[in-house]
Amino acid sequence: MRHRGVATLAALGFALAVAGCGGGGGGGDGTPLTKAQYEQHLATDSQAITKAFQPLSTPPSSLSVLASQLKVGQEKLRSAADDLNGVTPPKDVEKDNQALAKGLQTLADELESLRSAAAKKDPALVQKALNGLKSSHALVDARAATDDMRKKGYKLGGFS
């Protein structure tokens, strides 16, 4: 059962990477980024989030290790959300950018119950938290935003 839960979490991490996330620099002065600048911005943090959640692609050696990995992942999600909130995206993806930033921040917050359960080394709480994440709207909202960006011709990291 623990393996299924970890597989679900790994799928969440992969889906986040596929969703594409913000990156550092540019566009914070109110001047909209160009499409190419914005695509580069998305690619940068997408890679950071992929790297942060990579350890979750295999079952962790312990719940303590899982808690540590989740903490890093949460930090990357929050950083990406902050980056997205700090830039001026191209006009045609302003709403998508806001939805993606909100989705990433919300998901980072929602992962706290899982991280806390893992830190307590309580498998039953971990499973309960994983079940709660399965019904999260944050990932769905972020995915909808990136799907819309793709329809508008944006390349999101190496995943489009």
Task: Cite the ranges covered by each PLM segment.
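Alpha-helical segments in soluble extracytoplasmic regions
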Residues: 31-159
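C-terminal motif of bacterial Sec signal peptides marking the signal peptidase cleavage site
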Residues: 17-20
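Bacterial signal peptide processing site
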Residues: 22-25
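Bacterial N-terminal signal peptides that target proteins for export
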Residues: 1-10
